[in-house]
């Protein structure tokens, strides 16, 4: 006998029941039987939350601002980041506009990571009322707090009183330059507030007293005051405000200190600045007794030559950077003009700054540069006397690369893991 079969009509009825009943059952389970998604409770103690694919969406809805670390347990960079997030989380939770910090094991919850384009660890994202933006700034706790405060702030803050101005400056902290527009219409700077949002604070003061005019040292309005609290610098722009080129030049120039101390963080800040860099290279920019005097003279030159960026660096402080300019200790202190890419120029007759009248020597250097009396060199070039040594270094490097390639070619599971995201603060 053949196996009994169901009539076609019965099959159709069963399928219809499955289509109608199963979705309703599933929704009821997700909603806890009440027909509504369970509300996520944000803890008030400022700890880092551990989220998963079951509560992530609810957490995004509950927290207006949610900063998420998509991590993997085996990732070394993630392990080093964890204590920084633990330190930053209570500070961010205590802001006037709180930011909740959370983490997700994206190696375990791969679909959740894939949904937000996570292809390496750690991946950091800020969810602003549900809208994700990848964060690529510093991962040190204090700088992380400053950067996130800046990201969630309005492009231009409107201040209605002296107390509001003081609170704005205090809340901004020391991490970024500030622009305070006294008697300046918001519409005149809102474009730049958006354009340079990640690099400075912008505000307009609609009501203020004469005390503010005295404190910020301006005597008429409209006036745009630039304050760089980290370097204790201040400058004032009185206009013209109807010419965007002049206004943006002032803003762009004020994003950097008058003389930039070169380090890994400040070099990154130069990327968006189109000016070349007049770089003074010292043996030691901290302990050398002549360094303060040299930097003071360099500051005077910088204020008179705003079409150039001026900076200084000590060999003892950052040898890896200074050696790319092929300078010798016997030639220090020296000056070059660097294009921030592949070339730099030395000025003929100004190869070394001799002790004495530094002001005149720096003036002659700038005159020689503007007159074109320069020799162009490639960044990373070495003198002929170092070719033999470099050849040895290159050989050692190639052997090391070969060994690494052989090692990683034998890895199985490890190669299948998403890459770790290195980040240099």
Curated annotation (Swiss-Prot):
Entry GO MF terms: protein disulfide isomerase activity
Domain Thioredoxin: 29-153
Site features described as Contributes to redox potential value, chain residue numbers: 76-77
Localization terms from the record: Membrane
Active site positions, chain numbering: 75 (nucleophile), 78 (nucleophile)
One Pfam family recorded for the sequence: Thioredoxin
Disulfide bonds: 75-78
Role noted for this protein: Acts as a protein-folding catalyst that interacts with nascent polypeptides to catalyze the formation, isomerization, and reduction or oxidation of disulfide bonds. May play a role in storage protein biogenesis.
Record protein name field: Protein disulfide isomerase-like 5-3
Gene: PDIL5-3
């Amino acid at each position: 006998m053949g196996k009994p079969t169901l009539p076609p009509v019965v099959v159709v009825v069963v399928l219809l029941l499955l289509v109608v009943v199963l979705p309703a059952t599933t929704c009821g389970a997700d909603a806890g039987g009440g027909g509504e998604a369970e509300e996520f409770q944000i803890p008030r103690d400022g700890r880092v939350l551990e989220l998963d694919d079951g509560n992530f969406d609810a957490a995004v809805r509950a927290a207006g601002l949610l900063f998420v670390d998509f991590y993997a347990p085996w990732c070394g960079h993630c392990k080093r980041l964890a204590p920084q997030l633990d330190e930053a989380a209570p500070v961010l939770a205590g802001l006037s506009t709180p930011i909740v910090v959370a983490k997700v094991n994206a190696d375990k919850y791969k679909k959740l990571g894939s949904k937000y384009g996570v292809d390496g660890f750690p991946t950091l994202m800020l969810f602003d009322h549900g809208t994700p933006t990848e964060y690529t700034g510093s991962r040190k706790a204090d700088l992380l707090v400053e950067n996130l405060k800046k990201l969630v702030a309005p492009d231009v803050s409107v201040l209605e009183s002296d107390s509001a101005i003081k609170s704005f400056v205090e809340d901004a902290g020391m991490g970024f330059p500030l622009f305070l527009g006294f008697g300046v219409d918001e519409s005149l700077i809102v474009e730049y507030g958006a354009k340079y949002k990640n690099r400075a604070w912008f505000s307009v003061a609609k009501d203020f007293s004469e005390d503010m005019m005295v404190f910020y040292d301006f005597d008429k309005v409209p006036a745009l005051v630039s304050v760089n609290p980290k370097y204790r610098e201040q400058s004032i722009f009185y206009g013209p405000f109807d010419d965007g080129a002049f206004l943006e030049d002032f803003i762009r120039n004020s994003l950097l200190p008058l003389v930039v101390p070169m380090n890994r963080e400040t070099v990154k800040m130069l990327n968006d600045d189109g000016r070349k860099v007049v770089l003074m290279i010292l043996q030691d920019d901290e302990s050398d007794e002549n360094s303060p005097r040299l930097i003071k003279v360099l500051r005077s030159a910088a204020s008179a030559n705003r079409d150039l960026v001026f900076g200084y660096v000590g060999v003892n402080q950052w040898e890896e950077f200074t050696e790319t300019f092929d300078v010798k200790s016997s030639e220090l202190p020296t000056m070059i003009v660097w294009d921030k890419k592949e070339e730099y120029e030395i000025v003929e007759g100004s190869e070394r700054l001799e002790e004495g009248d530094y002001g005149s020597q720096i003036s002659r250097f700038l005159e020689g540069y503007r007159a074109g009396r320069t020799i162009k060199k490639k960044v990373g070039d070495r003198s002929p006397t170092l070719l033999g040594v470099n050849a040895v270094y290159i050989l050692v490097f190639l052997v090391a690369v070969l060994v690494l390639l052989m090692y990683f070619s034998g890895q199985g599971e490890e190669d299948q893991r998403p890459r770790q995201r290195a980040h240099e603060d």
